[in-house]
Structures are given as structure tokens and as C-alpha cells.
A protein has these predicted regions:
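A short alpha-helical cap/connector motif
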Residues: 1-157
């Protein structure tokens, strides 16, 4: 079974609005790896059922992906209510962490048992187009915190 053709295009593509092509590229990339157990790490988590075009629905899609192909998926969010919402929507295969993302990523980067990352999806700080510096700075801190788990070929989104 092909995730992009059999699941993503049928269940998610038309819900995601302008984000759909980016997500399609992410899953096409994962499938091109031909890897049995890819590792996906996300910051920022699903917050609502309704906002497919804007809010954190990647958590649900990444969960579907690892349920089909196997692998590891971790999502980090600082807000307990977001974690609780996501727990009600994803399978037990997803690892959800309630923490400041930079602190959690730093811990993961030092965990010898945690695999190298295939897709790093940084979405924990919403971008303000009128003032992009705070979001950019936060995501750079996240990237530096997880850097030891980045490998040649890691897709960073």
C-alpha cells in the first residue's frame, strides 16, 4: 500500500488547503527513503478537529503514516490541553510529550536509544508575518537542540 496514493490523497489532500502540497512532498520523501522504520519528530501538536488548513493537523496525519508503514513518531507541545486533545485522536504508537520543545528536543538529542531523524517538522511557534523574528528565533533554538539527531538527508520543515 502506498500512503500518498491510498490514504493521503483520498483522506487529507483536499482538507489541507494551501498546505497540501508541502505535506504531499513530506510523504513522498518518506516513501522515497524505502525505510522500514522512519522517524518523524514534530514540535507543536494537533489542537482542534476543525482547522485542517491551519492548525496542527499534521499530528493526525503522521500518526496514520506510522500506523501504515511502521516507524517512530514523536510530537511535543507545551500545552497540556493540546496533548490531551491529541491523545484522544492518535494511536498508542505516537509518543506525545508535554514540555517546552527546546528542553524536550535537547533531552531527545542526548538519548542514545532515540533513532536519527528522517523528518523534523518544526511547528511549535506560530509565525506572525508582520513580526517573523520571534518564530524564527524559536525554531532555530529547536534545531540547535536536536542537531545531534539530524543526519544527512533529514528533511527539515
Amino acid at each position: 500500500m502506498n500512503f500518498v496514493i491510498d490514504i493521503f490523497n483520498k483522506s487529507y489532500y483536499f482538507k489541507l488547503g494551501k498546505r497540501r502540497d508541502t505535506f504531499q512532498k513530506i510523504f513522498e520523501y518518506l516513501e522515497s527513503l524505502d525505510k522500514k522504520n522512519p522517524t518523524i519528530l514534530e514540535t507543536g501538536i494537533a489542537r482542534t478537529n476543525e482547522n485542517w488548513e491551519g492548525d496542527g493537523m499534521s499530528t493526525l496525519i503522521f500518526d496514520d503514516y506510522i500506523n501504515l508503514v511502521g516507524g517512530n513518531f514523536t510530537s511535543i507541545d507545551i500545552e497540556p490541553s493540546n496533548i490531551n486533545f491529541a491523545k484522544s485522536k492518535v494511536s498508542s504508537k505516537s509518543n506525545l510529550i508535554c514540555s517546552d520543545s527546546v528542553i524536550a528536543l535537547h533531552k531527545i538529542s542526548r538519548d542514545k536509544a532515540y533513532p536519527m531523524i528522517d523528518v523534523l517538522y518544526l511547528d511549535s511557534f506560530d509565525l506572525d508575518w508582520n513580526n517573523p523574528i520571534p518564530s524564527s528565533f524559536h525554531h532555530m533554538k529547536e534545531l540547535l537542540a536536536i542537531y545531534p539527531k539530524i543526519q544527512k538527508g533529514t528533511l527539515i520543515v
